[in-house]
Amino acid sequence: AGGADNFMRF
């Protein structure tokens, strides 16, 4: 999940 990982990075 690209979107989910990007959110977790923030």
UniProtKB/Swiss-Prot annotation:
Organism: Sarcophaga bullata
Keywords in alphabetical order: Amidation, Neuropeptide, Secreted
Lineage of the organism: Eukaryota, Metazoa, Ecdysozoa, Arthropoda, Hexapoda
UniProt modified residues of type Phenylalanine amide: F10
One GO CC term, this protein: extracellular region
GO BP terms, alphabetized: neuropeptide signaling pathway
Subcellular location: Secreted
Predominant location: secreted
Coiled coil in keyword set: no
Family that this chain belongs to: Belongs to the FARP (FMRFamide related peptide) family.
Keyword Secreted in annotation: yes
Top-level taxon: Eukaryota
Protein's recorded name: FMRFamide-8
